[in-house]
Amino acid sequence: MPKRTDIHKIMVIGSGPIIIGQAAEFDYSGTQACLALKELDYEVVLVNSNPATIMTDKEIADQVYLEPITLEFVSQILRKEHPDAILPTLGGQQGLNMAMELSKSGILDELHIELLGTKLSAIDQAEDREQFKALMEELGEPVPASGIARTVDEALAFAKQAGYPVIVRPAFTMGGTGGGIAETPQQLHDITENGLALSPVTQVLIEQSIAGYKEIEFEVMRDAADNAMVVCNMENFDPVGIHTGDSIVYAPVQTLADREVQLLRDAALKIIRALKIEGGCNVQLALDPNSFNYYIIEVNPRVSRSSALASKATGYPIAKMAAKIAVGLHLDEIKNPVTGTTYAEFEPALDYVVCKIPRWPFDKFTHADRRLGTQMKATGEVMAIGRNIEEATLKAVRSLEIGVHHVEEPALRSVDDDVLSDKLIHAQDDRLFYLTEAIRRGYPIDELAELTKINVFFLDKLLHIIEIEQALRTHTDDIETLTVAKRNGFADQTVADYWHETIDQVRDFRLAHKLAPVYKMVDTCAGEFASETPYYYGTYEFENESIVTKRPSVLVLGSGPIRIGQGVEFDYATVHSVKAIQKAGYEAIIMNSNPETVSTDFSVSDKLYFEPLTIEDVLNVIELEKPVGVIVQFGGQTAINLAKPLADHGIKILGTSVADVNRAEDRDEFDKVIKALAIPQPAGDTASDEATALAIADKLGYPVLVRPSYVLGGRAMEIVKKRTDLDYYMHNAVKVSHDHPVLVDSYLVGKECEVDAICDGQTVLIPGIMEHIERAGVHSGDSMAVYPPQSLSAAVQAQIVDYTEKLAIALNCVGMMNIQFVIHDDQVYVIEVNPRASRTVPFLSKVTNIPMAQVATRAILDQSLAEQGYQTGLVTPGPLVHVKAPVFSFSKLNRVDSLLGPEMKSTGEVMGSDVTMAKALYKAFEAAKLHVPSHGNVLLTVRDEDKPETVALAKRFHALGYQLLATRGTATALTTHGLPVTTVDKIDSGERDLLHRMEAGEIQVVINTVSDEEQAENDGTLIRNTSIMHGIPLFTALDTVAAILQVRESQSFVTQAL
C-alpha cells in the first residue's frame, strides 16, 4: 500500500532532556524519523525541550518547537498547528506518556488527531502491567507469577504468598525507574513506596524473581498488512535481574541452539502481531538455561535504546523504517538504504559479533551505590564490532575510556578471595574485571558460572583471553603469538605491558611484519548482495573492503560514550563539523564508538569507522585513509586528549595547534599569556605535591578552589574551606592528575558567565555571552544560563568582549574556544579558557541562529570569518530571553548527594524561551520537571552564612501565600524578622519529624544549603535524598530559589485589604 494521502501534517514528540535510561538514542531515532517523513513530503512539526540535539535543528523538521513536553505546552502547539496525526513512538517513554496524557485530556478527539504507529490500546496493553499480563495469558505466552499492587500492603501480601525474592516493576516508567529486586519485606516496602511514587498511574507489578535466566531481546518490525520480521536478536552477558541497559550485550545471540532461537522468535512475532503495532517494537524474554522454558519479561511498544543498538549493529535503520510504516508503507515497498537493491522485509544477517558495554557515572559519583539491579544506572554505552567475541569485547573495553585498555584492573590483584567472591555474586559495574581476576587466580569457570549465573560459554571466552595473556608473557617479540593476540582484540598497549616494551616498539614490530588491520563493511546481508554503505569496522584478517578515494579527506574524532561532563552536545558539534567539511568539498570521515548518536548514523558522513578512540585505532585508520588532517575540537576531552599523541606521530591537527592548546590548559604556560595581556585572574598557583598545595592555600587564604589540570566536567574539583579538608582532598585528587599538577586558586564569590567564540586566527566572532544564575562555585554545566545577559552592565560586557578577543588572538586560536569568567566587585576575572567546542555550543547555536560548529570548521579549513559573511565582535541579540536549565538523574542513583558544587552532576539540559525572563524561566523549570505548586509548605534549612539572604527569600514566599516551615536555627532567624514560621524537629525525633512530613506529602518545596559540620551534612543528605525519592522540588542554591520566586511572582496578583 502506498503512503497515506489523507494526512499531510504530522507532529513528532521528542524525548526531552537526557536522563539515565533515556539518552542520545532518541535524538538519533527522532532525527531519522523526521527526515524520513519529510522525504515522503509530509509537513513535520517537532516538539522537544532539549537544545543539545540535532533533532531540534531547523532543517530537520518544517516547524521546530523547543518547548516543554507538558500537557499545557503541547496542547497549545496542537491548537496552533492543527496536525492530522502524532507519531509518539520515537520519543522514548516521554513521548509515549505524553501521547497517553493528550488522549486522556480529550484534545486529540476534539481536534480529530490520530496516533500513528502504535494505537493507544497497544501502549496500554504493553505498559499497563495488569493488561499486559492478561494479554500474555490470552496468547498462551508464559509470564512469571505476579500480582498488581497499588499500595505497599498489596505488594507485601503477594510476596508473602509467593515467597521472596520478588521483582518490582512500576508501570509507564523507563530504565527500570523505581524498580528493584526485594529479598526481604523491608526492602519490598521501600522499593514499592518509591515505585508507586514514580509511576504516573501509581501501579507496580510484583513478580516472582526469575533472576539467573538468560536474558534475550528481539527487535521486531510489523506493517499494516501484518508482515512481521526480526531485525536483530541480542543476548545479555548478564543474566535476568540486571537491567538490559546496565548489561553487556552481544548481537547476534551466542549461546542458543537453533530450536531455542525459533521458539523465542515465534513468541516475539506473535506478540507484535497481537498488539497490532505498526513500526518497531522490542521484546525482552527470559530463557531457562537448563530447559526450553521461557518467560516474556516485557515489551516496549516503541523505538528504544535497544533499537538504536540493533540499528547500528546491523546497519538496518529501524527508526527510519518505523516512520515510513507508520504512514502506511509496507515492508515489501521500502528499499533497504544499505544495499539499495533489497527491500526492508529481508531480515539482516551478521557475519561479525557486536558487543555493547554500558558506561557508568561512578568515576564522578564515588559514593554512589554501584550494585546493579533492575533499575538502570548507566549514562551511556559503547559498541564494538569484531570477528569473534574476544575481539568485540576487548575493543569495547578500550572504548569505555575508564583508564584501562584491557580486561585487567591492576588494583584488583590485592583484593582478598572473600571480597572477590562477594563482588562476583553481587554484580557491580566492574564485574567483568573481577571475573577475569578470578580466572587468573585459577577459579574454575564452572564454579564461576554457578556463582554468577553467567553462561559458561562467555566465561570460556574470557578464559581464552587469559590464555593469550600467558602466551604473550612467555613469547616476547613473537609474531605468531602477536597475530593470535591481535585477532582476538588485544591492544598494542596491552602487548607492550606483557613484553615490557613501549607501545611504539610493539607498533613498529607489528608493521615491520606487515600485521595491520583491514576494514570490513557493515552491509546488513553478510556479503550476500552488493552493498554501498560507507560503514566499517577494523579486524585482523585478509581482505580490506574500505576503498580509499582520490578526494582529499578530513577525519573528525567523535566524543565516545555519553557520560556526565561529556554529553550529546559534543556529538551535535561533530555532526555539524562534518556538514561543513562536506560543503567545503572534502570527504568527511567520522570515527566514533557510541551506538546511540547521530554521528554514528552511516548516512551522516562519507565514511564511518566504528572503532575505539585510542591512539592505536586512530593511527590505523589514518594509515589507510591518509586524510589531510584531523579535527579534534568537537569531540570533547576524548578527542583533545588524542591531539598530542597524534601530533607526536607527525599527524596534522587542524585548527588550534597542540602547542597552543597546551598554552591554554597548562597552568604555568597560561599564566605567562594572561600576564602579558594584563588580564586579571584569581590568584593561584600549581602544586605537584601535598606540602606545596597546603603552603599555597595558606598564602592565599581559605576558601580555595582546587582542581587537577586537563579535565572536563569539573572532575575532582572542590571548594575547600579549611586546611584539614585540603589535606584529605590531596590524598584523593592527586591520583587523578597523571603527571599533571593540581591547581590551587583563590575562590572568588561572584557572578559567573561564559562565552563561546570562533576565531579564524585573525578575527574573533562572539555569538553571545551567557550569564549564569547560580553564583561561582556551581559547575557551569549545572548552572542555569541566560542569554542575553540580564544583569551585566554594558561596561562589564565590553570588558568580557575585549578579554575574549585578546585571548583568542594571543593563543592563536583557529576554530572554537570557550572562556569562563567571574565578576567580583565589578571586576571581570578569567577562570579558565578551553580551546575547543564546549557543551553550550548547541544552545548558543539555536538561540543566535549561527551554526557555530560549521562556522568554526570552515575557519579551520582556512575560510576567514569575513569570507563567510560574518562581522567580528559581539553579535547583537534578538528580542527573546533564553534560559538553559540542567536536568539531573538523582532518582536513579542511590547515595549520590544532590548538593551542587564545582563537580558536574547533571546528565542533560532543557531550554525555555520567551519575551520576558520570568516566562523563559517558567518554561525551563517546567521542561526540567521542577514544578513548584502555587501554594503549600516551604521547608527551609540553611547554613548560618546564608541566613540573611534566606530571610529575604522567605519574605517573598510569605507574600505569595506559602506557609513557612524551618529547622530550629533557620526558624529563629526568620521569627526575628517577624515571619510566621512552624519549627520542625530535626531527623530522628519521632512522628512529626522532617522526613515523616516529607513522606506524608506535607512539604511542597525544600530549600537546603549545607554547612561544614559533619552531622548537619548527614542530616542534609537525608533531607535531600528524601525529597528526591518523593519528587519534591529541591533547591541547594539560593540563586535558583530567587529565579523560581521571580516566576511565581510574575504569575500572581496582589491581594490587599484596604
Swiss-Prot record:
Locate the residues binding Mg(2+) 2. 298, 300
The entry marks the following residues as binding Mg(2+) 4, namely 832, 834
Cofactor(s), names only, from the UniProt record: Mg(2+); Mn(2+)
Enzyme Commission numbers on file: 6.3.4.16, 6.3.5.5
Q: Which residues form the ATP-grasp domain?
A: 133-327, 671-861
The residue ranges of the MGS-like domain are 930-1058
- Sites binding ATP 2 sit at 707, 746, 748, 752, 777-780, 820, 832
The record's listing under Pfam families reads: CPSase_L_D2, CPSase_L_D3, MGS
The record's InterPro entries line, in alphabetical order, gives: ATP-grasp (IPR011761), ATP_grasp_subdomain_1 (IPR013815), CarbamoylP_synth_lsu (IPR006275), CarbamoylP_synth_lsu_oligo (IPR005480), CarbamoylP_synth_lsu_oligo_sf (IPR036897), CbamoylP_synth_lsu-like_ATP-bd (IPR005479), CbamoylP_synth_lsu_CPSase_dom (IPR005483), MGS-like_dom (IPR011607)
Tell me the first and last residues of the signal peptide: none
This chain belongs to which protein, by name?
Answer: Carbamoyl phosphate synthase pyrimidine-specific large chain
Q: Which organism is it from?
A: Lactiplantibacillus plantarum (strain ATCC BAA-793 / NCIMB 8826 / WCFS1)
